[in-house]
From Swiss-Prot:
The gene coding this protein: NANOG
One GO cellular component term noted in the UniProt record for this chain: nucleus
GO terms for MF: DNA-binding transcription factor activity; DNA-binding transcription factor activity, RNA polymerase II-specific; DNA-binding transcription repressor activity, RNA polymerase II-specific; RNA polymerase II cis-regulatory region sequence-specific DNA binding; transcription cis-regulatory region binding
Family according to the record: Belongs to the Nanog homeobox family.
Native source species: Pan troglodytes (Chimpanzee)
Subunit structure: Interacts with SMAD1. Interacts with SALL4. Interacts with ZNF281/ZFP281. Interacts with PCGF1. Interacts with ESRRB; reciprocally modulates their transcriptional activities. Interacts with NSD2.
Keywords on record: Activator, Developmental protein, DNA-binding, Homeobox, Nucleus, Repeat, Repressor, Transcription, Transcription regulation
Name of the protein in its database record: Homeobox protein NANOG
Length: 305
């Protein structure tokens, strides 16, 4: 076990001694030892040279591939252009429509019929087309176009006409009547006619007032009320009437069963009062006073009552 580690230690010393003694040997040995590596490198160089063309070919393939990819792209625009040209060739064919030129007589007949009837049935269109020497489709399209034109014209001119119609058709406004009167008569402050007709004649206060007028007319022609009101009115409380009031009251105090002598004595005591009463009775018995009472009762207002 002790000999084995000693051997490697002695060997480097021997090698070192050999190297010291022969100095040029390492110079020779160096290339000899490096030669196989050079050979290996030279052997590897052909291999690398043989391998290097492969990447170059791949590079060429990669470089060629974009060219191949771009080449169809260059062809695609041509196909698109061809398709566009084909579409352009087809579009004018679709737009080419034969426009029928109507004569003046045909237009007059069509317009006249359109004014009378905007929608025609199948038989009517066929009859009209036979009369005008036109096809059914031509008559149908003309009526459709004419209806569209009329609708467009109405739509454009409708606001102007509608404003004029509303201004003409609006009911005239009337001022409010009897503004200072009772609220029952203030039926329509704004003065619109339909509101006036609905509320005036259906109002309870108006009917009550008419009933009061009827009661007033009956009351004025009633004999009892007319006598009491005419005698109790302030207009008849004149000094001429008051002069015989005491004598009249003294006469009214006696009963109807009293003897005539007592009545004559009382009348003589009254003196001139009796003459005044007789004169007033004669005055009120004349037809002129009756007419005066009637005129007064009819001309009296409710406030006097």
């Amino acid at each position: 076990m002790s000999v084995d580690p000693a051997c490697p230690q002695s060997l480097p010393c021997f090698e070192a001694s050999d190297c010291k003694e022969s100095s040029p040997m390492p110079v020779i040995c160096g290339p000899e030892e490096n030669y196989p590596s050079l050979q290996m490198s030279s052997a590897e160089m052909p291999h690398t040279e043989t391998v290097s063309p492969l990447p170059s070919s791949m590079d060429l393939l990669i470089q060629d591939s974009p060219d191949s990819s771009t080449s169809p792209k260059g062809k695609q625009p041509t196909s698109a252009e061809n398709s566009v040209t084909k579409k352009e060739d087809k579009v004018p064919v679709k737009k080419q429509k034969t426009r029928t030129v109507f004569s003046s007589t045909q237009l007059c007949v069509l317009n006249d019929r359109f004014q009378r009837q905007k929608y025609l049935s199948l038989q009517q269109m066929q009859e009209l087309s036979n009369i005008l020497n036109l096809s059914y489709k031509q008559v149908k399209t003309w009526f459709q176009n004419q209806r569209m034109k009329s609708k467009r014209w109405q739509k454009n001119n409708w606001p102007k006409n509608s404003n004029g119609v509303t201004q003409k058709a609006s009911a005239p406004t009337y001022p409010s009547l009897y503004s200072s009167y009772h609220q029952g008569c203030l039926v329509n402050p704004t003065g619109n006619l339909p509101m006036w007709s609905n509320q005036t004649w259906n109002n309870s206060t108006w009917s009550n007032q008419t009933q009061n007028i009827q009661s007033w007319s009956n009351h004025s022609w009633n004999t009892q009320t007319w006598c009491t009101q005419s005698w109790n009115n302030q207009a008849w409380n004149s000094p001429f009437y008051n002069c015989g009031e005491e004598s009249l009251q003294s006469c009214m105090q006696f009963q109807p069963n009293s003897p005539a002598s007592d009545l004559e004595a009382a009348l003589e005591a009254a003196g001139e009062g009796l003459n005044v009463i007789q004169q007033t009775a004669r005055y009120f018995s004349t037809p002129q006073t009756m007419d005066l009472f009637l005129n007064y009762s009819t001309n009296m207002q409710p406030e006097d009552m």
